[in-house]
A protein has these predicted regions:
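Internal mixed beta-strand/loop scaffold within catalytic domains of large alpha/beta enzymes
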Residues: 90-191, 343, 355-358
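Active-site loop ensemble at the mouth of alpha/beta enzyme cores that anchors a bound cofactor
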Residues: 251-274
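Short N-terminal edge-element motif at the start of the domain
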Residues: 209-221, 230-231
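A short, sequence-level motif marking secondary-structure junctions
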Residues: 124-125, 186, 254-260, 362-364
Length: 381
Protein backbone atom coordinates (compact mmCIF):
# COMPACT_ATOMS: atom_id res chain seq x y z
CA UNK A 1 0.00 0.00 0.00
CA UNK A 2 1.26 3.44 -0.95
CA UNK A 3 -0.45 6.60 0.30
CA UNK A 4 1.38 9.91 -0.05
CA UNK A 5 0.10 13.48 0.30
CA UNK A 6 1.90 16.63 -0.85
CA UNK A 7 0.81 20.28 -0.89
CA UNK A 8 0.89 21.74 -4.41
CA UNK A 9 -0.09 25.35 -3.80
CA UNK A 10 -2.06 27.56 -1.44
CA UNK A 11 -3.85 30.91 -1.56
CA UNK A 12 -3.33 33.21 1.45
CA UNK A 13 -2.54 30.05 3.42
CA UNK A 14 -6.28 29.34 3.57
CA UNK A 15 -7.24 27.63 0.30
CA UNK A 16 -5.09 24.56 -0.32
CA UNK A 17 -4.61 22.26 -3.30
CA UNK A 18 -2.83 19.00 -2.49
CA UNK A 19 -1.80 15.90 -4.42
CA UNK A 20 -2.42 12.36 -3.17
CA UNK A 21 -0.89 9.24 -4.70
CA UNK A 22 -2.72 6.12 -3.53
CA UNK A 23 -1.77 2.64 -4.72
CA UNK A 24 -3.01 -0.73 -3.47
CA UNK A 25 -6.27 -2.57 -2.98
CA UNK A 26 -9.46 -0.54 -3.08
CA UNK A 27 -10.01 -1.27 0.60
CA UNK A 28 -6.55 -0.04 1.58
CA UNK A 29 -7.00 3.11 -0.52
CA UNK A 30 -10.35 3.68 1.18
CA UNK A 31 -8.71 3.25 4.57
CA UNK A 32 -6.10 5.88 3.72
CA UNK A 33 -8.77 8.33 2.57
CA UNK A 34 -10.89 7.58 5.63
CA UNK A 35 -7.98 8.27 7.97
CA UNK A 36 -7.40 11.60 6.23
CA UNK A 37 -11.11 12.47 6.52
CA UNK A 38 -11.29 11.83 10.25
CA UNK A 39 -7.83 13.01 11.31
CA UNK A 40 -7.31 16.07 9.11
CA UNK A 41 -10.88 17.15 8.35
CA UNK A 42 -12.96 16.02 11.34
CA UNK A 43 -15.65 14.62 9.04
CA UNK A 44 -18.44 13.44 11.34
CA UNK A 45 -20.26 10.24 10.38
CA UNK A 46 -22.65 10.16 13.34
CA UNK A 47 -25.52 11.88 11.51
CA UNK A 48 -28.92 10.30 12.16
CA UNK A 49 -29.94 8.19 9.17
CA UNK A 50 -32.48 5.61 8.10
CA UNK A 51 -30.70 2.28 8.62
CA UNK A 52 -33.09 0.42 6.30
CA UNK A 53 -32.19 2.75 3.42
CA UNK A 54 -28.48 2.39 4.18
CA UNK A 55 -28.77 -1.40 4.15
CA UNK A 56 -30.52 -1.25 0.77
CA UNK A 57 -27.90 1.15 -0.60
CA UNK A 58 -25.01 -0.98 0.63
CA UNK A 59 -26.58 -4.04 -1.00
CA UNK A 60 -26.94 -2.16 -4.30
CA UNK A 61 -23.35 -0.88 -4.32
CA UNK A 62 -21.92 -4.25 -3.32
CA UNK A 63 -23.57 -5.78 -6.40
CA UNK A 64 -23.28 -2.93 -8.92
CA UNK A 65 -20.11 -1.06 -7.89
CA UNK A 66 -17.92 -3.48 -5.87
CA UNK A 67 -14.84 -1.27 -6.32
CA UNK A 68 -16.46 1.57 -4.40
CA UNK A 69 -17.95 -0.84 -1.88
CA UNK A 70 -14.43 -2.08 -1.10
CA UNK A 71 -13.26 1.52 -0.58
CA UNK A 72 -16.28 2.09 1.66
CA UNK A 73 -15.12 -0.84 3.79
CA UNK A 74 -11.78 0.94 4.17
CA UNK A 75 -13.55 4.21 5.03
CA UNK A 76 -15.54 2.43 7.74
CA UNK A 77 -12.49 0.71 9.25
CA UNK A 78 -10.71 4.06 9.53
CA UNK A 79 -13.64 5.17 11.70
CA UNK A 80 -13.56 1.96 13.72
CA UNK A 81 -16.80 0.77 12.11
CA UNK A 82 -18.01 -1.97 9.77
CA UNK A 83 -20.31 -1.96 6.75
CA UNK A 84 -22.42 -4.46 8.66
CA UNK A 85 -23.47 -1.55 10.89
CA UNK A 86 -26.21 0.30 9.01
CA UNK A 87 -26.35 3.17 11.50
CA UNK A 88 -23.61 4.98 9.57
CA UNK A 89 -23.40 6.02 5.94
CA UNK A 90 -19.99 5.51 4.37
CA UNK A 91 -21.16 5.78 0.76
CA UNK A 92 -19.91 9.40 0.71
CA UNK A 93 -18.36 11.99 3.04
CA UNK A 94 -19.05 15.57 3.98
CA UNK A 95 -22.08 17.70 3.26
CA UNK A 96 -24.39 18.17 0.29
CA UNK A 97 -24.09 21.90 -0.36
CA UNK A 98 -25.24 24.23 -3.13
CA UNK A 99 -24.07 23.56 -6.66
CA UNK A 100 -21.09 24.72 -8.64
CA UNK A 101 -21.26 26.95 -11.71
CA UNK A 102 -19.12 25.50 -14.48
CA UNK A 103 -18.13 25.83 -18.13
CA UNK A 104 -16.34 23.25 -20.28
CA UNK A 105 -15.46 22.61 -23.92
CA UNK A 106 -14.25 19.38 -25.47
CA UNK A 107 -12.00 19.66 -28.55
CA UNK A 108 -11.58 16.29 -30.33
CA UNK A 109 -8.18 15.33 -31.81
CA UNK A 110 -9.34 15.95 -35.39
CA UNK A 111 -9.50 19.74 -34.83
CA UNK A 112 -6.34 20.40 -32.77
CA UNK A 113 -2.87 21.23 -34.07
CA UNK A 114 -1.11 18.38 -32.26
CA UNK A 115 -3.97 15.88 -32.79
CA UNK A 116 -4.56 15.59 -29.04
CA UNK A 117 -8.04 15.73 -27.55
CA UNK A 118 -8.63 18.38 -24.85
CA UNK A 119 -11.25 19.39 -22.32
CA UNK A 120 -10.87 22.96 -21.06
CA UNK A 121 -12.90 23.32 -17.88
CA UNK A 122 -13.76 26.03 -15.32
CA UNK A 123 -15.09 25.10 -11.87
CA UNK A 124 -16.78 28.12 -10.27
CA UNK A 125 -17.98 28.46 -6.69
CA UNK A 126 -18.94 31.15 -4.18
CA UNK A 127 -16.28 32.02 -1.62
CA UNK A 128 -17.74 33.54 1.59
CA UNK A 129 -15.93 36.71 2.61
CA UNK A 130 -15.30 35.11 6.00
CA UNK A 131 -13.61 32.08 4.40
CA UNK A 132 -10.59 32.56 6.70
CA UNK A 133 -12.85 31.97 9.68
CA UNK A 134 -12.45 28.43 11.05
CA UNK A 135 -16.24 28.02 11.19
CA UNK A 136 -16.82 29.25 7.63
CA UNK A 137 -18.82 26.78 5.51
CA UNK A 138 -16.53 26.92 2.50
CA UNK A 139 -15.94 23.32 1.36
CA UNK A 140 -12.98 24.01 -0.93
CA UNK A 141 -10.52 25.10 1.76
CA UNK A 142 -8.79 21.77 1.12
CA UNK A 143 -9.08 20.26 -2.35
CA UNK A 144 -7.22 17.19 -3.55
CA UNK A 145 -5.89 15.82 -6.80
CA UNK A 146 -6.24 12.09 -6.19
CA UNK A 147 -3.92 9.96 -8.34
CA UNK A 148 -5.18 6.45 -7.72
CA UNK A 149 -3.80 3.06 -8.78
CA UNK A 150 -6.23 0.38 -7.53
CA UNK A 151 -5.47 -3.28 -8.12
CA UNK A 152 -8.82 -4.12 -9.70
CA UNK A 153 -9.77 -1.17 -11.92
CA UNK A 154 -8.32 1.51 -14.18
CA UNK A 155 -5.88 4.03 -12.66
CA UNK A 156 -7.22 7.58 -12.61
CA UNK A 157 -6.68 11.18 -11.56
CA UNK A 158 -9.62 13.02 -10.02
CA UNK A 159 -10.42 16.28 -8.22
CA UNK A 160 -12.36 16.12 -4.94
CA UNK A 161 -12.77 17.59 -1.45
CA UNK A 162 -13.96 15.82 1.70
CA UNK A 163 -16.30 18.60 2.79
CA UNK A 164 -18.42 18.32 -0.37
CA UNK A 165 -19.43 14.68 -0.93
CA UNK A 166 -15.86 13.37 -0.75
CA UNK A 167 -16.43 12.04 -4.26
CA UNK A 168 -14.80 12.95 -7.58
CA UNK A 169 -16.04 16.10 -9.33
CA UNK A 170 -14.07 15.34 -12.48
CA UNK A 171 -11.16 13.27 -13.70
CA UNK A 172 -9.37 11.23 -16.34
CA UNK A 173 -8.26 7.61 -16.38
CA UNK A 174 -5.35 5.69 -17.86
CA UNK A 175 -7.33 4.93 -21.03
CA UNK A 176 -7.95 8.61 -21.81
CA UNK A 177 -11.60 8.64 -20.71
CA UNK A 178 -12.43 11.97 -19.08
CA UNK A 179 -15.57 12.78 -17.07
CA UNK A 180 -16.57 16.30 -15.98
CA UNK A 181 -19.56 17.33 -13.86
CA UNK A 182 -21.54 20.55 -14.29
CA UNK A 183 -24.39 21.51 -11.97
CA UNK A 184 -27.77 21.40 -13.69
CA UNK A 185 -29.42 24.66 -12.68
CA UNK A 186 -32.30 24.31 -15.16
CA UNK A 187 -33.78 21.09 -13.77
CA UNK A 188 -33.36 22.52 -10.30
CA UNK A 189 -35.37 25.61 -11.24
CA UNK A 190 -38.27 23.47 -12.47
CA UNK A 191 -38.14 20.89 -9.70
CA UNK A 192 -36.86 22.25 -6.41
CA UNK A 193 -38.12 19.13 -4.58
CA UNK A 194 -36.09 16.74 -6.75
CA UNK A 195 -33.30 16.45 -4.15
CA UNK A 196 -33.58 13.72 -1.51
CA UNK A 197 -31.17 15.37 0.99
CA UNK A 198 -30.17 11.88 2.10
CA UNK A 199 -28.77 8.64 0.73
CA UNK A 200 -31.07 6.50 -1.41
CA UNK A 201 -30.60 3.21 -3.25
CA UNK A 202 -28.47 3.73 -6.36
CA UNK A 203 -25.92 6.28 -7.59
CA UNK A 204 -26.07 9.85 -6.30
CA UNK A 205 -25.21 12.72 -8.64
CA UNK A 206 -21.41 12.48 -8.19
CA UNK A 207 -20.75 8.76 -7.74
CA UNK A 208 -21.03 7.99 -11.51
CA UNK A 209 -17.90 10.07 -12.17
CA UNK A 210 -15.45 7.79 -10.37
CA UNK A 211 -17.51 4.76 -11.43
CA UNK A 212 -16.90 5.54 -15.10
CA UNK A 213 -13.22 6.29 -14.48
CA UNK A 214 -12.82 2.98 -12.63
CA UNK A 215 -14.59 0.76 -15.12
CA UNK A 216 -14.81 2.29 -18.63
CA UNK A 217 -12.24 2.92 -21.36
CA UNK A 218 -14.43 4.53 -24.06
CA UNK A 219 -17.38 6.90 -24.38
CA UNK A 220 -19.47 4.03 -25.73
CA UNK A 221 -18.78 1.92 -22.64
CA UNK A 222 -19.57 4.93 -20.42
CA UNK A 223 -22.93 5.50 -22.11
CA UNK A 224 -23.91 1.85 -21.70
CA UNK A 225 -22.90 1.96 -18.04
CA UNK A 226 -24.95 5.10 -17.34
CA UNK A 227 -28.01 3.58 -18.98
CA UNK A 228 -27.87 0.59 -16.64
CA UNK A 229 -27.47 2.18 -13.19
CA UNK A 230 -30.12 3.68 -10.91
CA UNK A 231 -29.77 7.42 -10.19
CA UNK A 232 -30.97 9.81 -7.51
CA UNK A 233 -30.03 13.34 -6.40
CA UNK A 234 -28.90 14.05 -2.84
CA UNK A 235 -28.63 17.80 -3.39
CA UNK A 236 -28.30 18.99 -6.99
CA UNK A 237 -28.98 17.50 -10.41
CA UNK A 238 -25.82 17.49 -12.52
CA UNK A 239 -24.95 16.73 -16.10
CA UNK A 240 -21.74 15.07 -17.26
CA UNK A 241 -19.39 15.78 -20.16
CA UNK A 242 -17.67 12.56 -21.21
CA UNK A 243 -14.95 12.15 -23.86
CA UNK A 244 -12.46 9.46 -24.83
CA UNK A 245 -9.07 9.17 -26.52
CA UNK A 246 -10.60 8.32 -29.91
CA UNK A 247 -12.51 11.62 -30.15
CA UNK A 248 -15.95 10.34 -29.17
CA UNK A 249 -17.98 12.37 -26.69
CA UNK A 250 -21.43 12.99 -25.26
CA UNK A 251 -23.23 14.91 -22.53
CA UNK A 252 -25.37 12.98 -20.06
CA UNK A 253 -28.36 15.01 -18.86
CA UNK A 254 -31.86 14.58 -17.44
CA UNK A 255 -35.20 15.40 -19.03
CA UNK A 256 -36.88 18.67 -17.90
CA UNK A 257 -38.81 16.85 -15.16
CA UNK A 258 -35.66 15.09 -13.94
CA UNK A 259 -37.10 11.61 -14.51
CA UNK A 260 -35.49 10.42 -17.76
CA UNK A 261 -31.90 10.10 -18.97
CA UNK A 262 -30.87 12.12 -22.02
CA UNK A 263 -27.70 11.58 -24.08
CA UNK A 264 -26.52 14.43 -26.34
CA UNK A 265 -23.89 13.12 -28.75
CA UNK A 266 -20.79 15.07 -29.72
CA UNK A 267 -19.16 15.25 -33.15
CA UNK A 268 -15.60 14.03 -33.77
CA UNK A 269 -15.01 17.07 -36.01
CA UNK A 270 -16.31 19.95 -33.85
CA UNK A 271 -16.12 21.26 -30.25
CA UNK A 272 -18.72 20.18 -27.69
CA UNK A 273 -19.65 23.10 -25.40
CA UNK A 274 -21.47 22.74 -22.09
CA UNK A 275 -22.24 25.00 -19.13
CA UNK A 276 -24.93 24.83 -16.43
CA UNK A 277 -27.60 25.17 -19.10
CA UNK A 278 -28.84 21.84 -20.44
CA UNK A 279 -28.04 21.16 -24.08
CA UNK A 280 -31.34 19.32 -24.55
CA UNK A 281 -33.17 22.57 -23.71
CA UNK A 282 -31.39 24.95 -26.07
CA UNK A 283 -34.41 24.76 -28.38
CA UNK A 284 -36.84 25.40 -25.50
CA UNK A 285 -37.75 29.05 -26.16
CA UNK A 286 -39.72 29.37 -22.93
CA UNK A 287 -36.70 28.30 -20.91
CA UNK A 288 -34.19 30.41 -22.82
CA UNK A 289 -36.38 33.51 -22.50
CA UNK A 290 -36.68 32.92 -18.76
CA UNK A 291 -32.89 32.73 -18.44
CA UNK A 292 -32.43 35.82 -20.63
CA UNK A 293 -34.77 37.82 -18.39
CA UNK A 294 -32.60 37.23 -15.35
CA UNK A 295 -30.40 40.10 -14.27
CA UNK A 296 -27.61 37.82 -13.00
CA UNK A 297 -25.10 35.90 -15.08
CA UNK A 298 -26.19 32.37 -15.88
CA UNK A 299 -25.19 29.24 -17.77
CA UNK A 300 -26.95 30.30 -20.97
CA UNK A 301 -24.92 33.52 -21.03
CA UNK A 302 -21.67 31.60 -20.71
CA UNK A 303 -22.73 29.09 -23.36
CA UNK A 304 -23.31 31.90 -25.86
CA UNK A 305 -19.99 33.54 -25.01
CA UNK A 306 -18.20 30.25 -25.68
CA UNK A 307 -20.18 29.82 -28.88
CA UNK A 308 -19.19 33.29 -30.11
CA UNK A 309 -15.52 32.77 -29.24
CA UNK A 310 -15.31 29.37 -30.94
CA UNK A 311 -17.11 30.65 -34.05
CA UNK A 312 -14.15 33.02 -34.57
CA UNK A 313 -11.53 30.25 -34.43
CA UNK A 314 -9.73 29.00 -37.52
CA UNK A 315 -9.12 25.31 -36.95
CA UNK A 316 -6.95 23.42 -36.20
CA UNK A 317 -6.61 25.02 -32.76
CA UNK A 318 -3.63 25.18 -30.37
CA UNK A 319 -3.67 24.13 -26.72
CA UNK A 320 -2.85 27.71 -25.73
CA UNK A 321 -5.90 29.10 -27.53
CA UNK A 322 -8.06 26.33 -26.05
CA UNK A 323 -7.09 27.56 -22.59
CA UNK A 324 -7.51 31.24 -23.51
CA UNK A 325 -11.08 30.77 -24.76
CA UNK A 326 -12.16 29.70 -21.28
CA UNK A 327 -10.80 32.91 -19.78
CA UNK A 328 -13.76 34.68 -21.41
CA UNK A 329 -16.12 32.85 -19.06
CA UNK A 330 -14.04 33.05 -15.88
CA UNK A 331 -16.17 34.24 -12.96
CA UNK A 332 -14.76 37.08 -10.83
CA UNK A 333 -17.48 39.12 -9.10
CA UNK A 334 -17.63 40.61 -5.59
CA UNK A 335 -20.90 40.68 -3.65
CA UNK A 336 -21.79 41.84 -0.16
CA UNK A 337 -21.30 38.50 1.57
CA UNK A 338 -19.45 36.37 -0.95
CA UNK A 339 -16.99 36.36 -3.82
CA UNK A 340 -17.95 34.59 -7.04
CA UNK A 341 -14.79 33.00 -8.42
CA UNK A 342 -13.49 30.47 -10.89
CA UNK A 343 -11.77 28.27 -8.31
CA UNK A 344 -10.04 25.96 -10.77
CA UNK A 345 -9.24 25.84 -14.43
CA UNK A 346 -8.30 22.37 -15.66
CA UNK A 347 -7.01 21.26 -19.05
CA UNK A 348 -7.49 17.55 -19.67
CA UNK A 349 -5.43 15.93 -22.43
CA UNK A 350 -7.31 12.75 -23.38
CA UNK A 351 -4.46 11.61 -25.63
CA UNK A 352 -1.64 11.77 -23.06
CA UNK A 353 -4.00 10.96 -20.14
CA UNK A 354 -2.90 14.04 -18.21
CA UNK A 355 -4.31 17.19 -16.63
CA UNK A 356 -3.11 20.69 -15.76
CA UNK A 357 -4.93 22.27 -12.81
CA UNK A 358 -4.72 25.95 -11.87
CA UNK A 359 -6.03 27.27 -8.54
CA UNK A 360 -7.86 30.63 -8.75
CA UNK A 361 -6.76 31.43 -12.33
CA UNK A 362 -8.23 34.97 -12.25
CA UNK A 363 -5.73 35.82 -9.51
CA UNK A 364 -2.54 33.92 -10.20
CA UNK A 365 -1.80 31.64 -13.15
CA UNK A 366 1.39 30.40 -11.44
CA UNK A 367 -0.56 28.31 -8.91
CA UNK A 368 -0.66 25.35 -11.29
CA UNK A 369 0.15 21.65 -11.22
CA UNK A 370 0.59 19.01 -13.96
CA UNK A 371 -0.38 15.36 -13.44
CA UNK A 372 -0.26 12.31 -15.67
CA UNK A 373 -1.80 8.93 -14.92
CA UNK A 374 0.23 5.80 -15.70
CA UNK A 375 -1.24 2.84 -17.56
CA UNK A 376 -1.00 -0.65 -16.15
CA UNK A 377 1.33 -2.90 -18.12
CA UNK A 378 -1.52 -4.98 -19.52
CA UNK A 379 -3.78 -1.95 -20.13
CA UNK A 380 -6.74 -3.50 -18.29
CA UNK A 381 -8.40 -3.07 -14.87
Amino acid sequence: MKFEKKLITTFQNEIHLSHIIAEGTNESIGSGLGALAINDHDIDKSTKINSAIIESQYDYLRNHYPEHYARMSGFAKAYGKSLNDYNYDFSFFGQALNGTACSAVYYPPAITCNKHGYISRNLDFSIPKDFKNKNSRFPFKHTYILEMYPESCFPSISLFCFELFGLAFEGINSEGLSVIHLADADTRIDHETLSTNQTQRGFNEFLPIQYLLDTCSTADEAEKALRQVEHYHVAIPVHLLIADKQGNSFVFEYSPDGSKKVFVQGNIASPLKVTNFQLNRLSDTTMTKMMESRSIENGLDRYRVLEDQIDQVRFPITEKLIQEINTNVYVHADHEDELERTLFHSTYDTTSCSVKVCLLPTINRSMEGFFKVRRKSNGSP
